[in-house]
Amino acid sequence: VNHALASFVPINPDGSAVYLTSLSNSAILDGMGAILAYGKHKNEDQRYEFSTTFEASFNVMKNLNVRANYSYLHYNYQTMNRTVNVPYSKYPGEISYLTTGSGVNQLKETQTNHWYQAFNVYGDYMLDIADHQIKIMAGYNYETKRLKDIKVSRQGLLSDDLNDLNLAVGDAMTMSGGQNEYALLGAFYRLNYSYKGGRYLFETSGRYDGSSRFRSGHRFGFFPSASVGWRISEEPFFGNLKKNIDNVKLRLSYGSLGNQQVGYYDYIQTINTNGTMNYIFGDQKKGSYASVSDPNSADLTWETVSTWNVGLDLGFLNNRLNLTADAYVRDTKGMQTSGKKLPGAYGANEPKQNACLLYTSDAA
């Protein structure tokens, strides 16, 4: 990076910008002085976001409620970058132009769109029978997201003031784009049971999810959870201990979660058509080629994180002082990682597989 001495001024006496001088062969002020003096470079960033949610609830019958909601999000991001040839003067009466780097005569435009939709419907039912309290919840979930990018640039602008690709007539032009889409479909439930006003507690829940990120036959996974609790302090035998200890609760739980965070199409072997060879043929343009991606794993599926936990809760001084102790064991199966090492002669990287296991434990 080259900067200027304090004796250099950004503008010559004749009003032209300073970029190079007879005393320096390096760009003065890194060329920014000339660019700012001309004032024709322009950048614009625009972001738009629209989101809405509709929700409805129904009381179907006593203790039975059904709810449904729909969410929609559209995100749009646009950029425009215009750079032009920048005039400057090295000697009096002689105008030169900066035509490389930041002085390339070019217009770039990009546009990114995200569309997201989610639909949920679920119901819950409560039932009290003597000392038994039961609550059941079950539902359905669907969500999808689509992403699309467009990028265009072209040189040879006919105007230094107008921003329109129709006014770019140069041969140097690039265009690129891309789009991705995924969908997630799932059903879920939760059952809560309480006996004797919360003396004995039980809960079970689970999800059955399917993801478009995996090949058909490997898209769905079931992830259950369950927990039990015993409030020892509510037992009759606890008796006089209540004077000093307000709450004693023993907990035991097991839970599993699914992880689908892989690429949108990792299970598909793709073809890249944007390659350019370093060879010039008769039309004086570099030849294009298509290349096949690295091999993929056909049985890539969900990563599953399972956790066992045991805990103890204590409450003192009318529950103003609370102590909690926990110990857990976590087992992560099917972690996505590079698969079996392939011979160097194969000429490609190893495909991702559910080939890694992580085991952790702790107590606090």
Model-derived regions, located:
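A subset of solvent-exposed loop/turn segments in beta-rich extracellular surface proteins, enriched
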Residues: 10-36, 87-100
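Conserved Walker B
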Residues: 364
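Low-complexity intrinsically disordered tracts that form flexible linkers/tails across taxa
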Residues: 1-8
